[in-house]
Amino acid sequence: MKYTLEICAGSYYDALEACKGQADRIELNSALHLGGLTPSLASLILTKTSTDLKVICMVRPRGGGFCYGEADTQTMYADAKLLLENGADGIAFGFLNEDYTIDIPKTEHMVSIIKQYNKEAVFHRAFDCTDDPYSSIETLIKLKIDRVLTSGQRNKATEGKELIKDLQSKYGNQIEILAGSGINSTNAIELINYTKISQVHSSCKEWLFDSTTSNTNVSYSYNGKDQYDVVSSIKVKELKDSLCGKQ
């Protein structure tokens, strides 16, 4: 069986690394240290012209949660259209109400935008913040979401494997289940074999040093070590090889 490897990319550089490591698909973002925000059009255009990767673009206007006011919502709709017009193969997004349920009208409208371009609608890990994963996934199916990214409502997919397995068993023939968070070359196959999913999402992260992140009196560091995170093509290839049974 062929397994799909999706890499969480935070830039055009990351996309190139994912391609070098033989990923099948990327979720293109910016600001991964905030959980991933909407990418620039330039990063999408460069990725599509330089690689053969399937590119799902994140549409998320800010950090924090997923209950959006009118300004953020309109920004998301407009961003989705621009990204789709410039070659995105799909859009990853999530709308929740204050009570942790799926915001049906906003989700429905976003899906309608995506389907105008015949592209994929992906509900991201906002799903992991919902109050009831079963009623939530049934709602997403009714709204014609193609795929849901989930860690099984735990911090790591390995911790949420029971729910992932159950969702795959009950709904896997109606919606694609994409497991993500904490997946690497050492645990991917075990998770796949246990849950019966066929695709995984990973950051394959490494850290690079930039001395200009701080000086004696000023710091722009977010991890305290004057480093920033990028995708490692070596880790991508290791994960890909593990999925292909080469390790």
Task: Give residue ranges: language-model regions.
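N-terminal pre-domain/capping segments
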Residues: 1-39
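Catalytic cores of alpha/beta
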Residues: 10-20, 67-79, 128-143, 167, ...
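Active-site-adjacent beta->alpha loops and helix N-cap segments on the catalytic face
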Residues: 13, 32-53, 71-73, 97-114, ...
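Conserved, mostly hydrophobic/aromatic
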Residues: 18, 83, 110, 124, ...
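C-terminal alpha-helical cap/extension of soluble enzyme domains
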Residues: 171-247
